[in-house]
C-alpha cells in the first residue's frame, strides 16, 4: 500500500473541503495541488478532482437536511410543517430546479471537452484573476436587498444565478464564487446567497461526480485506487462540514474582498511560475 499516495489524497481532501464553499475555485486549487504533488496519473487525478467534491456536498446535505427535506416536501405538497419549517418551501424547490437546468445542459454537453482542454494551470490562473476583479466590482456596488432568505429568491433571479453558475464549468472560476457573487449582484442577502449556493451545488456536484465516475471508472484499476478515492471523499466531507459552519458566520459579518485578493495573487503567481519555469499540468 502506497502510504505517500494516501497522504496526498488526505491533503487533496483538505484542499477540497476548505475551498469548495469559498469563492476561490476548489477545482482550480485541486488542479494546482495535484500538479505540485505529482498526484497520480493525469487520468486518475482528473477523475479524483471531480469525484472528491461529492464529500463536500454530502456535508451540505448533512448540515441542512431539515431544510432540504422541507423544501422537497413543500415542492410536492406545498406545505412545510414542524421544526425547520420554511415559509415558502415550494418557491425554494422551484428556484433550485430552475437554477440547476442551465449548468446541467451545458455541463452534459461540454464536460469532456472542458476537462481535456481547460484543466490546466493557465486557465486556472486567468479565471482566478478575472473572478477576483468581479468580486471587487460587486462588493463596491450598493445593491438593495430584495431576497432576505434563500426561499425568497424568485424564479427569474434563480435562472440568472443558474446562468452565472455555467461559468464555473471553467476551472478557476469557482462554482460557489459565481453563484454567491451573482446572487449578491442580483440583490440576495449575504447569508441567503451563501445558503442558496450550498443548496444549488447538490444536484450539480452529485450529477457531475456520479456521471464522471460511471464514464471513467475503468481508470481505477485496483482496490487501492478505490481506497485512495474513498479517503479523499471522506476527508473532504469532514473538512467541508467545518468550513460550511465557519462561512455562514463569516458572511454575516464581513465581505469577500479578502478572497478577491487571494484569487488575484494566486493567479499572478501561477502565471509567473508557468512563464518562468514552463509549468504545465502533468500528462
Curated annotation (Swiss-Prot):
GO terms for molecular function: undecaprenyl-diphosphatase activity. Catalyzes the dephosphorylation of undecaprenyl diphosphate (UPP). Confers resistance to bacitracin. The gene is uppP. The chain crosses the membrane at residues 4-24, 45-65, 91-111, 118-138, 153-173, 194-214, 228-248, 258-278. This is Undecaprenyl-diphosphatase. GO terms for biological process: cell wall organization; peptidoglycan biosynthetic process; regulation of cell shape; response to antibiotic. Its main location: membrane. It is an enzyme of class 3 (hydrolase). GO terms for cellular component: plasma membrane. Bacitracin is thought to be involved in the inhibition of peptidoglycan synthesis by sequestering undecaprenyl diphosphate, thereby reducing the pool of lipid carrier available. Belongs to the UppP family. The keyword Cell inner membrane applies. InterPro entries: UppP. Its EC number is 3.6.1.27. It is found in: Cell inner membrane. Keywords: Antibiotic resistance, Cell inner membrane, Cell membrane, Cell shape, Cell wall biogenesis/degradation, Hydrolase, Membrane, Peptidoglycan synthesis, Transmembrane, Transmembrane helix. It catalyses: di-trans,octa-cis-undecaprenyl diphosphate + H2O = di-trans,octa-cis-undecaprenyl phosphate + phosphate + H(+). NCBIfam families: PRK00281.1-2, PRK00281.1-4, undec_PP_bacA. The keyword Disulfide bond does not apply. It is a multi-pass membrane protein.
Amino acid at each position: 500500500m502506497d502510504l505517500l499516495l494516501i497522504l496526498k489524497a488526505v491533503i487533496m481532501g483538505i484542499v477540497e473541503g476548505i475551498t469548495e464553499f469559498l469563492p476561490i475555485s476548489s477545482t482550480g486549487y485541486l488542479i494546482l495541488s495535484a500538479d505540485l504533488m505529482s498526484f497520480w496519473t493525469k487520468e486518475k487525478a482528473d477523475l479524483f478532482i471531480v469525484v472528491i467534491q461529492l464529500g463536500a456536498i454530502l456535508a451540505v446535505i448533512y448540515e441542512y437536511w431539515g431544510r432540504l427535506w422541507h423544501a422537497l416536501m413543500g415542492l410536492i405538497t406545498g406545505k412545510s410543517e414542524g421544526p425547520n419549517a420554511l415559509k415558502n418551501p415550494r418557491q425554494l424547490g422551484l428556484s433550485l430546479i430552475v437554477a440547476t437546468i442551465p449548468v446541467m445542459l451545458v455541463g452534459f454537453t461540454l464536460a469532456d471537452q472542458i476537462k481535456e482542454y481547460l484543466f490546466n494551470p493557465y486557465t486556472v490562473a486567468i479565471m482566478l484573476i478575472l473572478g477576483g476583479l468581479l468580486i471587487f466590482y460587486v462588493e463596491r456596488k450598493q445593491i438593495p436587498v430584495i431576497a432576505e432568505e434563500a426561499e425568497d429568491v424568485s424564479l427569474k433571479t434563480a435562472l440568472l444565478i443558474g446562468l452565472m453558475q455555467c461559468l464555473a464549468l471553467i476551472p478557476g472560476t469557482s462554482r460557489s464564487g459565481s453563484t454567491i457573487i451573482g446572487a449578491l449582484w442580483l440583490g440576495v442577502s449575504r447569508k441567503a446567497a451563501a445558503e442558496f449556493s450550498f443548496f444549488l451545488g447538490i444536484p450539480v456536484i452529485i450529477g457531475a461526480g456520479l456521471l464522471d465516475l460511471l464514464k471513467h471508472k475503468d481508470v481505477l484499476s485496483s482496490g487501492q485506487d478505490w481506497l485512495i478515492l474513498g479517503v479523499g471523499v471522506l476527508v473532504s466531507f469532514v473538512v467541508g462540514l467545518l468550513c460550511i459552519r465557519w462561512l455562514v458566520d463569516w458572511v454575516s459579518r464581513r465581505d469577500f474582498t479578502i478572497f478577491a485578493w487571494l484569487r488575484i495573487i494566486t493567479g499572478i503567481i501561477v502565471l509567473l511560475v508557468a512563464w518562468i519555469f514552463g509549468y504545465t499540468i502533468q500528462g
